[in-house]
UniProtKB/Swiss-Prot annotation:
Primary subcellular site in the record, as a coarse category: nucleus
Role description: Transcription factor required for the development of GABAergic interneurons in the dorsal horn of the spinal cord and migration and further development of hypaxial muscle precursor cells for limb muscles, diaphragm and hypoglossal cord.
Organism listed in the record: Homo sapiens
Subunit: Interacts with SKOR1 which acts as a transcriptional corepressor.
Disease per UniProt entry: Central hypoventilation syndrome, congenital, 3: A form of congenital central hypoventilation syndrome, a rare disorder characterized by abnormal control of respiration in the absence of neuromuscular, lung or cardiac disease, or an identifiable brainstem lesion. CCHS3 is an autosomal recessive, neonatal form characterized by slow and shallow breathing due to a deficiency in autonomic control of respiration. Affected individuals present with respiratory insufficiency and absence of the hypercapnic reflex that stimulates breathing.
Pfam families noted in UniProt: Homeodomain (PF00046)
Name of the protein in its database record: Transcription factor LBX1
GO biological process, one term: negative regulation of cell population proliferation
GO molecular function: DNA-binding transcription factor activity, RNA polymerase II-specific; sequence-specific double-stranded DNA binding
Bias type Basic and acidic residues, positions: 1-20
């Protein structure tokens, strides 16, 4: 009977001592210690004992979870003895772990925002385009014939008369002056190229001179549309100029931009019917 009881008690004692058997052996006490070395700090009995007790407490907690019977009281007693230090260690580990995760997530979020921010740049909103009616274009062209630059009073009057804003009137006149300048530059380029072709291009030079005179006259308060178009095949000759050999009698057409100013203004208005001009809201 005693041998059987001893045999039954032996496994119980082994189970009781099993968590403590895994503890590390004590440090060598024969080695001389210095108070400020890292090894001495780590080999202090209090520090090693605290870590060993925390390890034993974790082992006992795991054993209590998996084992239905056993020694929950001894494990709880040992865990209660070392609970402040173990709780501090767990709290510190959880705190630093949470900080690392939050820092990584914040960094990833910033990287993602910068990447998507570079790709998904908002498009610049285009300005609205004002489509003028035929009546508005006709009145603006008629006013542009004798007045290239408007005073504030004239601008207000035209805007009120045509149902436009001051900004729309200003923009239209700016674009119209720029278009007149481009037409003159294109005409000059055509004349320069005609000079290189031969004497037949001299007729266009006379037409260009008259066109420039008319544009200067309109800028000073005279008439003229300022964007007359040279018609190929019907050059304009000054009075008394010799006729080109082989050419028939040349006559100025009644709708010529150099002779009939009202007709030219009507042509200008027809050319500008479908033109849209950018105007700020």
């Amino acid at each position: 009977m005693t041998s059987k009881e001893d045999g039954k008690a032996a496994p119980g004692e082994e189970r009781r001592r099993s968590p403590l058997d895994h503890l590390p052996p004590p440090a060598n006490s024969n080695k001389p210690l210095t108070p400020f070395s890292i090894e001495d700090i780590l080999n202090k009995p209090s520090v090693r004992r605290s870590y060993s007790l925390c390890g034993a407490a974790h082992l006992l907690a795991a054993a209590d979870k998996h084992a239905q019977g056993g020694l929950p009281l001894a494990g709880r007693a040992l865990l209660s003895q070392t609970s402040p230090l173990c709780a501090l260690e767990e709290l510190a580990s959880k705190t630093f772990k949470g900080l690392e995760v939050s820092v990584l997530q914040a960094a990833e979020g910033r990287d993602g925002m910068t990447i998507f921010g570079q790709r998904q740049t908002p498009k610049k909103r285009r300005k609205s385009r004002t489509a003028f009616t035929n009546h508005q274009i006709y009145e603006l062209e008629k006013r542009f014939l004798y007045q290239k630059y408007l005073s504030p009073a004239d601008r207000d009057q035209i805007a009120q008369q045509l149902g436009l804003t001051n900004a729309q009137v200003i923009t239209w006149f700016q674009n119209r002056r720029a278009k007149l300048k481009r037409d003159l530059e294109e005409m000059k380029a055509d004349v320069e190229s005609a000079k290189k072709l031969g004497p037949s291009g001299q007729m266009d030079i006379v037409a260009l001179a008259e066109l420039e005179q008319n544009s200067e006259a309109t800028a000073g308060g005279g008439g003229g549309c300022g964007r007359a178009k040279s018609r190929p095949g019907s050059p304009v000759l000054p009075p008394g100029a010799p006729k080109a050999p082989g050419a028939g009698a040349l006559q100025l057409s009644p709708a010529s931009p150099l002779t009939d100013q009202p007709a030219s203004s009507q042509d200008c208005s027809e050319d500008e019917e479908d033109e849209e001009i950018d105007v700020d809201d």
